[in-house]
Amino acid sequence: YLCSAEIYQGANHYGRYLTHGSMQLLADGDPVSAFGSGFRQEGWDWRHIPGTTALEIPMERMKADIRNVDTASGYEEMLLSDEAFAGGVSHRGRDGVFAMELHEHDKYNGSLRARKSWFFFDNRIVCMGSDIENKAEGGVHTTLFQNFLADAADPLVVNGEAVTQFPYRAELAGGAVLRDNLRNAY
């Protein structure tokens, strides 16, 4: 079974979506690192971890409540999903596939479900989500990317048009091509 997140009394209180299909591109830095690839703690929105399919909830509802765990566990939270399917294979460390079935634990919602798949070909990644459902109040979203923006003048490119407006929000219909401030295309 999948452990949905490791949350302790003094650590990771907002990490409940880490196992909802997170995938962060690490391609920059010398050596390549999370920091060099756009991750910074300051400004990070834990509701939008790259790759995750998650509920649209206010930040106040994100903090884990670990007071009601069983007496044997102590002050920690390691909730198990009732889904047991997750796995992947690779070919020569270059091409591969990973898939998982997501079911959020009943403590937080219990009705959020999805099937997620990633296909890795050369320098391309194809991410697919299907059978996404949620019976609880509020919407569901899948986050493509979240990067630290060191300079607001670094453009996001949407369908070939540079966007320097910050913050920026748009709803795109049909096919779209996005390029983040680190030159990763989606």
Question: Locations of the language-model features?
Answer:
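Catalytic and substrate-binding regions of extracellular carbohydrate-active enzymes
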Residues: 1-175, 179-185
